[in-house]
Amino acid sequence: MVGSESVYCGEQGRGGGDNVEAFRFPPGDAPLAACDCSRRVFCAGMLTGTLASAMSLGGCAARRNEAESSAVPAKQTSKRSSATKATAAPKSSWIAAIQQDIEALVESYGDSVSVYAVALDPQTFASFDGEVAVAPDARHAAASIIKLPILACALETVTAGELSLDEQITVTQQDIVGGSGNIQSRGAGVSYSIDELLHAMIAQSDNVAANLVIGRLGMDTVNETCAALGLTQTVLARLMMDTEAQAQGRENYTSARDAAAVLQRLAAGTIATPELCERARGYLLAQEDARGIVEGVPGGVLVAHKTGSLANAQHDAAIVYAERPYVLAILTQDLEREQALALERDISFAINARAHS
């Protein structure tokens, strides 16, 4: 049975009930304008070339710090070992130089934290010459980070001509679930385009939108995309808010490396057509949750990211358009929410300081 509005199990972020606001979709092709993003100001004049193009879609939604609540998911994780800390990537780049700093930040948390960061080429946004990795392949309950591979699958399906962003899907009463997002407040009988659903799934972490997209693509198709992309620790095993599936032990999983891999491909524009990747980056730039990684980045630096939370998990994965751009994914479990968010902020700050040095 899929959970109802009265059971808020969090699949990240924004809840129903009193927290539901008027549902809206910023137009995907709206021109960039200066806007206040909860203590961070992004202005069109600050960007040129690729970054300006990346901001041209999806807009910049007002970011809010909001309380979240959730129910307990199943837990499954890999133990950290010295082998997971070491990587085969060259250790000569600016980002690899802070491996020890990040290890020191997370040392006291044992197996509760996974971090993966990779430098990007400032021109092509392809992965560059170094990484930071602390238990990057440990498997975590994915929460709403699972929406990244769902997005990737949708983009690939559109590229293949098997799906249109303009295709309409009508919400039925059976589709209404609680947790994150505002579509639930509009009720059944309302139709949305695939483009609108993808935007809501990422920017607002909307669970109804995610389930509708999964239903259109097929769960097996999403998992096939994960396999094709080399996401070895990622699996989609249930719909959002499906408490019955959780009780039966079915859970969605991912790793820090897998989450970063999807974002790196989106940054480089290689997961689908460049135009579709640009639109997807617009969804990520419109993310409404401004905690975690965003708090460790100074104003004026663009962050395209996706967060995820459950009762015992707090995750964030981002493309950070710093002077030296990079992708950063931080997955935590069994920490108090504020403790996890503070750690995400501190890791983000440490890496971003090097990105501008």
Residues covered by each model-derived region:
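N-terminal twin-arginine translocation
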Residues: 21, 35-84
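Short, glycine/proline-biased beta-turn/loop segments that scaffold the active-site neighborhood
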Residues: 160-186
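N-terminal secretory signal peptides
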Residues: 1-38, 48-55
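Active-site SXXK
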Residues: 139-169, 328
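Conserved catalytic neighborhood of penicillin-recognizing serine enzymes
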Residues: 176-211, 219
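Short, Gly/Ser/Thr-enriched beta-strand-loop segments that form substrate-interacting elements
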Residues: 291-344, 352
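Beta-lactamase-like hydrolase cores
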Residues: 77-139, 350
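Mid-domain, small-residue-enriched loop/turn segments at the edges of structured enzyme/sensor domains
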Residues: 112, 211-263, 267-268
